[in-house]
Each structure stands twice: as C-alpha cells, then as structure tokens.
Amino acid sequence: MLYHLLYPLASDFRIFNVFKYLTFRTIYAVITALLVSFILGPWVIRKLEALQARQVIRTDGPESHLKKSGTPTMGGILILASIVIPTLLWADLTNRYVWTTLFVIVGYGLIGFTDDYKKVVEKNPKGLSPRQKMAGQLLIAGMAVCFLVFVVNMSTELAFPFFKRLHPDLSWFYIPFAMLVIVGASNAVNLTDGLDGLAIGPVAINAATYLLFTYIAGNAKLSSYLQTPYVPGAGELAVLCGAMVGAGIGFLWYNAYPAEVFMGDVGSLSLGGGLGTLAVITKQEILLVIVGGVFVVEALSVIFQVGSYKYRGKRIFRMAPIHHHFELKGVAEPKIIVRFWIITIILALVAISTLKLR
C-alpha cells in the first residue's frame, strides 16, 4: 500500500525513492511486524482469556505439562495480523506471488481458527474432524498450485540442492507434488508445536532462510550467477518473509518458556502452509526438507510411531512427536527447545551453503 501511495511521488520528493528498494521495504516489514506484535499482543492475550480460550492439556502426556492448563491459546491470530498488516503496507500489491502466499496463509489460518474455536471456546473436544481439516487444506493448496501453474505459468521443473544440472520436469505430476509440499509443511509445523517456543523459533529461521532465496530467485543476475531457478517477481516475497520473521520473533516474546500464550492450530497450520508455498514458488521444494529438518523429523516420528504400533504392536518412542520422547527421558523442556533451535540454525546454514556447493 505504501509502495503504491508514496513511490509515485518520488519524482517530486526524492526521499520516497527508497520505496523502490526491496531491501528497505523488507527491513521495515520486519519492524512493522514486531510493532504489531508488541502493540496488539497484550490486548489479544486479554481477549483470549476473556473468551476462556484456554489450552486443553492431555492427561496422558508429560506431567510437567499439567501446569500449562489454562494458558490461552489461539495466539496465532496475533501472528496472522503481524504477517498480513506489514505485507499489505510494504509489498507491491500487484504481485501475484504475494497474494497467492497470503491466500494460503489466511486460508489455513481460518481452518485452524475453526478447529481451535470449536475445541476451546465451544468446548467440543473433537473440533474439526481430521477429514474435514485435510479436505480444507487440500482444497486451498490445490487452488493455489493450479493458479500458479495455469495462470502464472510457473515452471513444473524440480530443482535439487547440490545438483545444478538436475531439473526433472514433473509435468502434471507437479500439481499433486506441490500440494503435498504445502499440506505436509503445514501439518509438520502443527505437530512440532508442542512446547513453549519450539515451533515459532524454527519457523522464524526458516522464513529468514527463504527471505534470502526469494530475493535471489527474483534477481536475474544473482540466480544466473548462483545457477538457481529464476522466478521473475518472486523477489517481492522477501517482504512477506520479512513479515514472517518479525511476526515470529514478536510472538516468541509471549510464547517463550514459560509461555503466556500458545499459537494453536490457527498459527501452526498457517505458518507451515506459508513456508510450503514459499518453497513451491521459489522452486526450492526439496530445500525445505533440509532447512525444515526439525519439522520433518517431528512428522516422521509420528508416522513411524503409529505405523510401528499398528503393525508390530510396539512403540518406537516413549511418546510422539519426538520432543515428548525427550521430555519423558528427563530432558528439561527449555533445553529441548533451545537444542531444536540450534539444530535449525545449523540446517539453515547447510541450506544456504547449497548456493555455492553445486
């Protein structure tokens, strides 16, 4: 919005010329997201407490979690506001990639909001059924991917980290593959959100990593030099990534151990869906497995646990997702959280190194 309002005035007021610079708008998207979080955060928490939107704690989980009973949830509403408002203020709103990513983030946020509202406000412990949630996720992901492929004419080739000449064209198979990336990322972040600050830290690190990759993808010279896929217009997503980073850090202010508020499904589903969409647009889908390695391991731990119990009658872990396994082994919650952050930082550095290791 500010880009469209103020940049045209640059011919008369040179100061407004800064709005043409993507780096300037990205930095201020981060700052704006932080301000939105800090200004609205206390108010959102009070409203959630007034609604009695309190987290329901599983009795079969770690005993240390029982003290968290009554902590407000649905804090993802604050995250959504901290992403959407800065993006609308600082991004080029004629960019179709920006709108596609916002569509997925808000759409998945609505699915999560509905599920959370039914569980914690209407006191319906089942919330949305797994089929209903999956149907909604697939529908939104399918609409986004079809728009990108058929309207934007996005390439259906796949890029592999470390291999500069390996670009297989999936053709029609790319559509279900891209949908799987978006839906899988959304649910993986959702599964990771089980400890104070455990999910939001890696999400912010992932968003910062994709900020770099969106900037490179949208720059013809840089993408050619680094031999990465060139996606005209993708650079504008750096603004949205900046908003995600700021929203993540801002929410962590309230979600750090011991948490004042939880993000709920409204936050985790939308953030994961946003990361998946960024990966699809930048043609860095496989890279998400690296930088989002913590999310991948969390999701796989659940899949392996369920599969092992169903077919062998035995559990692999004491409890899944795997962060609960470490809790039951006696590792302190803050230590698990910080170690997962450290692992994510290392994985982000490995992901960035793929720009040169080809």
UniProtKB/Swiss-Prot annotation:
Cofactor(s) listed: Mg(2+)
EC number(s) recorded for this UniProt protein: 2.7.8.13
Record pathway: Cell wall biogenesis; peptidoglycan biosynthesis
Principal location: membrane
Membrane topology, from the record: Multi-pass membrane protein
Organism for this UniProt entry: Geobacter metallireducens (strain ATCC 53774 / DSM 7210 / GS-15)
Family: Belongs to the glycosyltransferase 4 family. MraY subfamily.
GO cellular component: plasma membrane
Taxonomic lineage: Bacteria, Pseudomonadati, Thermodesulfobacteriota, Desulfuromonadia, Geobacterales
General function of this protein: Catalyzes the initial step of the lipid cycle reactions in the biosynthesis of the cell wall peptidoglycan: transfers peptidoglycan precursor phospho-MurNAc-pentapeptide from UDP-MurNAc-pentapeptide onto the lipid carrier undecaprenyl phosphate, yielding undecaprenyl-pyrophosphoryl-MurNAc-pentapeptide, known as lipid I.
Keywords: Cell cycle, Cell division, Cell inner membrane, Cell membrane, Cell shape, Cell wall biogenesis/degradation, Magnesium, Membrane, Metal-binding, Peptidoglycan synthesis, Transferase, Transmembrane, Transmembrane helix
GO biological process, one term: cell division
Transmembrane segments: 25-45, 73-93, 97-117, 134-154, 172-192, 197-217, 233-253, 261-281, 286-306, 335-355
UniProt name for this protein: Phospho-N-acetylmuramoyl-pentapeptide-transferase
Cellular compartment(s): Cell inner membrane
Reactions catalysed, as given in the entry: UDP-N-acetyl-alpha-D-muramoyl-L-alanyl-gamma-D-glutamyl-meso-2,6-diaminopimeloyl-D-alanyl-D-alanine + di-trans,octa-cis-undecaprenyl phosphate = di-trans,octa-cis-undecaprenyl diphospho-N-acetyl-alpha-D-muramoyl-L-alanyl-D-glutamyl-meso-2,6-diaminopimeloyl-D-alanyl-D-alanine + UMP
Gene Ontology molecular function terms on file: metal ion binding; phospho-N-acetylmuramoyl-pentapeptide-transferase activity; UDP-N-acetylmuramoyl-L-alanyl-D-glutamyl-meso-2,6-diaminopimelyl-D-alanyl-D-alanine:undecaprenyl-phosphate transferase activity
Listed InterPro entries: Glycosyl_transferase_4 (IPR000715), PNAcMuramoyl-5peptid_Trfase (IPR003524), PNAcMuramoyl-5peptid_Trfase_CS (IPR018480)
